[in-house]
Amino acid sequence: MAAFKLADRLATLPPYLFAGIDKVKAEVAARGVDIISLGIGDPDMATPGFIIEAMKEAIARPANHQYPSYVGMLAFRQEVANWYDRRFGVSLDPATEVIGLIGSKEGIAHFPFAFINPGDLVLVCTPNYPVYHIATGFAGGEVQFVPLLEENDFLPDLDAIPEDTWKRAKMIFVNYPNNPTAATAPLGFYEKLVDICRRFDVIIAHDTAYTEIYYDEDNRPPSILSVPGAKDVAIEFHSLSKTYNMTGWRVGMAVGNPTLVAGLGKIKENMDSGIFQAVQEASIVALRDGDDFCRELRGIYRQRRDTVITALHKAGIQCRVPQATFYVWARVPQGHTSADFVTRVLQETGVVVTPGNGFGTPGEGFFRISLTVDNARLEEAVSRIAKL
């Protein structure tokens, strides 16, 4: 058999975040231990019935089984624009400022190929979703990480970035509500970021997949596009995955600056064939009729969040009370690294949590809990951790 060599770009990939965890998990499971996984952020609840029924009807239409538009059906893009107007007060032209995605991950991964040339500098706020820097590397860009520190509420210190760096930078990736820290960003932060990026012609790529998982009705996470002038420099990536428990459906959208949207569309035109039209039709129903479901979903996550926070604080584990996302970002006990603590928790309790350093160097000293099992299992998981 021929010995084929992988492309050099794959040699630069960091180890898969969950590879080591999966190995230990298999060893623990082989001992007959009941595993509770609070690792990957994948909702445990079903897609709501009204969306499933819309999908059934859409599947029955023969036209939906043909090739879809690579940018998304105009009706889907129009509904995205309607939702943005209703939710954020942001006006979008569905023809030029909205594009459908096969999940936001696809769009984020493709985006650097549209605007980053070899050697271009891209700022990535970290700890972070790994796709930002991996996609940048694949496109030949140079990554400079910008730390998100607890003392700055897990926001990047924009003033600490030298002017020469801003002059060199082509793009910056930001993500709020944030994975993994669960931090939120106030409108004032976006205003400052937009001002700087307009001054230095830096593209803002904003991942905002968690805006609808929030816990304060009077302080809902904003869109960066709510800032006047943001469309000059920003594109925002969103998804139906977390909002409607649709991770497996693979549907999302990117909105904002028409040139940025068109550039991403040019990549997609040559790299994929768009979202299955039946999924788009069901997604129209989700965006149009899903507000009541989202309210109920937030109530469930709020109860789960409170269960975990109360138990962690009682056990002496430090963590902030998240105002958004379905994650809890907690400090590991003194004397442990993130990896050591997570491994010990798994080996001794059968509970899977994610080491903070897997999301970047500033994540060292933290671990992430996903609120993606029911309340009874969460109570059991945290009680096991508390006994360590």
Curated annotation (Swiss-Prot):
InterPro entries to which the protein is assigned, alphabetical: Aminotransferase_I/II_large, DAP-NH2Trfase_DapL_Desulfo, DapL/ALD1, LL-DAP_aminotransferase, NHTrfase_class1_PyrdxlP-BS, PyrdxlP-dep_Trfase, PyrdxlP-dep_Trfase_major, PyrdxlP-dep_Trfase_small
Binding sites annotated in the UniProt record for substrate: Y16, G41, K105, Y129, N179, R368
Cofactor(s) it depends on: pyridoxal 5'-phosphate
Assigned keywords, A-Z: Aminotransferase, Pyridoxal phosphate, Transferase
Top class in the EC scheme: transferase
Binding site for pyridoxal 5'-phosphate: Y70, S104, K105, Y129, N179, Y210, S239, L240, S241, R250
GO molecular function, one term: L,L-diaminopimelate aminotransferase activity
Entry's EC annotation: 2.6.1.83
Sites of N6-(pyridoxal phosphate)lysine modification: K242
Catalysed reactions, semicolon-separated: (2S,6S)-2,6-diaminopimelate + 2-oxoglutarate = (S)-2,3,4,5-tetrahydrodipicolinate + L-glutamate + H2O + H(+)
Pathway: Amino-acid biosynthesis; L-lysine biosynthesis via DAP pathway; LL-2,6-diaminopimelate from (S)-tetrahydrodipicolinate (aminotransferase route): step 1/1
Ranges in a coiled coil: none
BP GO terms, sorted: lysine biosynthetic process via diaminopimelate
Quaternary structure and partners: Homodimer.
Function: Involved in the synthesis of meso-diaminopimelate (m-DAP or DL-DAP), required for both lysine and peptidoglycan biosynthesis. Catalyzes the direct conversion of tetrahydrodipicolinate to LL-diaminopimelate.
Family stated for the protein in its record: Belongs to the class-I pyridoxal-phosphate-dependent aminotransferase family. LL-diaminopimelate aminotransferase subfamily.
Protein name (Swiss-Prot/TrEMBL): LL-diaminopimelate aminotransferase
Naturally occurring in which organism (per UniProt): Nitratidesulfovibrio vulgaris (strain DP4)
Taxonomic lineage: Bacteria, Pseudomonadati, Thermodesulfobacteriota, Desulfovibrionia, Desulfovibrionales
Name of the gene: dapL
